[in-house]
């Protein structure tokens, strides 16, 4: 699924990416390899900003990222990722690794014109739809259905309510 999501993001060297849901840090590391490949000039590097709502997961992901040598290309913070990460917005790409009830407006607002977001959307039951959200250079939003998926629910202000 990580590969499918990364391919759909159409990542390029130099992109600034917001990842909502850090998990172990694995997905952020794979994105960093594409947008900030070692061996390329640092001035061309992009950066991944990850927001994880569960403190223990965020701390583990940060430790994994640093130990794997990605600390200069990935920043992990603990907070409500459903609201995005306004400090570093706007983003070329946004990837959400938990299913939202709808596409959160703050994430769309923090996406650059010409940007792409990949997000699972649907109920908390086992199946959702992977959506590719594209913000045109005119600011208009287009969505493409990428198929059925099963993700944990997105929590936070713009996530599922329990």
Predicted ranges, named:
Residues 122-162:
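Active-site capping/gating segments
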Residues 1-7:
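A glycine-rich, Thr/Ser-enriched phosphate-binding loop motif common to dinucleotide/cofactor-binding enzymes
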Residues 10-138:
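Conserved nucleotide-cofactor-binding alpha/beta core module
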């Amino acid at each position: 699924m990580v590969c499918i999501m990364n391919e759909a993001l159409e990542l390029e060297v130099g992109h600034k990416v917001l990842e909502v849901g850090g998990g172990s840090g694995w997905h952020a590391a794979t994105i960093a390899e594409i947008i900030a490949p070692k061996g390329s000039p640092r001035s061309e590097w992009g950066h991944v900003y990850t927001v994880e709502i569960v403190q223990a997961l965020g701390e583990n992901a940060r430790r994994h990222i640093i130990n794997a040598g990605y600390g200069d290309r990935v920043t992990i913070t603990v907070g409500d990722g459903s609201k995005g990460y306004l400090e570093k917005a706007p983003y070329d790409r946004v990837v959400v690794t938990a299913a939202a009830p709808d596409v959160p407006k703050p994430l769309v607002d923090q996406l650059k014109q010409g940007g792409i977001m990949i997000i699972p959307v649907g109920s908390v039951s086992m199946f959702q739809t992977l959506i590719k959200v594209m913000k045109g250079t005119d600011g208009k939003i287009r969505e493409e259905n990428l198929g059925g998926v099963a993700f944990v629910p997105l929590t936070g202000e713009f996530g599922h309510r329990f």
